[in-house]
Amino acid sequence: MSSREISNAMSGISNQTAKDILKSEYPTIYNAYKDIADEQFELFAKKHLDYGMGNISAGTQLVNEGEINFAMTGLWYRLSDKINRWKNMIITNRKAQNESLIDTFQDITNYGIISQIVYKDLWKEN
């Protein structure tokens, strides 16, 4: 072991990433998160291919702040609908009639990621 490796080991510094440590210390959570993330991405891809670019850009080109804010407002409404559905299901203790609670979680997650893509000005075809 080199002196640097010894020094790093003694000071608790490691080349491990947070994901490496999570995988080691919490393998069930690590694997579940990865599986769900993969499922989310597949669901996003299928829906994006069905809806296309205009669903999120709301008919705009997302070329200026006003258009981006318009799209972000639309995303906020979609998220708000899903969160209110979740809240209503919890408060009323009712079983879902059309979509499962998992479907609601998936939609919230994907709309959150899409919002980040739009906010970072990356909602583009190329």
Tell me the role of every PLM-derived stretch.
Residues 1-126:
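Intrinsically disordered, low-complexity regulatory regions
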